[in-house]
Amino acid sequence: MKKKILMLVGPTAVGKTETSIALCQRLKGEIISADSMQLYRHMNIGTAKPSLEEQQGIPHHLIDIIEPDASFTVADFQSEAARLIDAITKRNKFPIVAGGTGLYINSLLYDMDFTSAVSNWNLRQKLQKDAQLYGNEYVYKKLQDIDPNAATKIHPNNVKRVIRALEVNYESGENFGDFKNDIEKNTCYEPLLIGLTRDRSELYERINYRVDQMIETGLIEEVKNLLDCGYTPELIAFKGLGYKEIIAYLEGQYDLEEAITILKRDTRRYAKRQLTWFNRYQEIQWYNLTDQSSSNIIEAILKNVEGYFNLS
């Protein structure tokens, strides 16, 4: 029997945390975080991680599970989420997957086999070093030369994805796009995919406010503490929004005002990319939080869930 899951997605700062908690309270659910930054311990402010008080007693999974220098792949998420969905279902609770990391959502929606995923750690490290020494454009030019089709679909500054495309090509001889085309829907789950959005002006105001709050509540001190603990700026965890900008400020690349301006701008751009990603899902059902009160949205989603899964 397929396991029922509610998937709640949307851009950063849209209101996923509050909405997912409210839904859990009504559905007797537990939350599985699909946020690649909230995995890390000691990184609370910059990841907008819900505090214990904000969690309101609702079980949250895949938050605070690894150190900032540890690795956690999409395959790891897929495996852990599958285990959690099974355990939550067996407890007669309702699994709610909530977050904005598109690849994590993909790994549950589609039958993606990571056990045979092509990888070459030595090559990856060399390409990462090339990007650091010669710049993002250097490795992007390599991709343009060997897989121009993939290069048109990947931003030059998305170094992680550029390197992954090169890795796939070097190891398999296949183009990155071809490697991804055989994906079919995951038959283990019966997902209801709900997307949260807001009018752009309101979303951007919320993003700007969130950044200001992060600074006021100690983001700079959080980053300093992490660096003082010996975590280095080269870590993948520090490539996340909020951390890379503050590290650049601490290194003297920007003054604080400029760092905050850049962080707000980059977060708005990230939200736009998230919306573009989630709009690709034909099955997604969108709810605009600007149009209605949060309580009305909750009731509308609950009615949808009950009808979709025949819960009434």
Swiss-Prot record:
Site Interaction with substrate tRNA: give positions: T101, R124
**Biological process according to GO:** tRNA modification
- The reply to whether Transmembrane helix figures as a keyword in the UniProt entry is no
GO MF assignments: ATP binding; tRNA dimethylallyltransferase activity
Q: Which InterPro entries match?
A: Dimethylallyltransferase, IPT, P-loop_NTPase
- UniProt enzyme class: transferase
Decide whether keyword Transferase is in the record.
Answer: yes
Cite the binding residues for substrate.
T12, A13, V14, G15, K16, T17
Query: Which Pfam family, an example, fits this chain?
Result: IPPT
Catalytic activity as recorded in UniProt:
adenosine(37) in tRNA + dimethylallyl diphosphate = N(6)-dimethylallyladenosine(37) in tRNA + diphosphate
Q: Where is this region: Interaction with substrate tRNA?
A: 35-38
From the UniProt record, list the coiled-coil ranges: none
Q: Which cofactor does it need?
A: Mg(2+)
Q: Which keywords fit this entry according to its UniProt record?
A: ATP-binding, Magnesium, Nucleotide-binding, Transferase, tRNA processing
Instruction: Tell me its EC number(s), please.
Output: 2.5.1.75
Residues where ATP binds: G10, P11, T12, A13, V14, G15, K16, T17
What's the family? Belongs to the IPP transferase family.
Relate the assembly described in the record: Monomer.
What is the stated purpose of this protein?
A: Catalyzes the transfer of a dimethylallyl group onto the adenine at position 37 in tRNAs that read codons beginning with uridine, leading to the formation of N6-(dimethylallyl)adenosine (i(6)A).
Quote the NCBIfam families the UniProt record gives.
Answer: miaA
Protein name as it appears in the record:
tRNA dimethylallyltransferase
Q: What organism does the UniProt record list as the source?
A: Alkaliphilus metalliredigens (strain QYMF)
Query: Gene encoding this chain?
Result: miaA
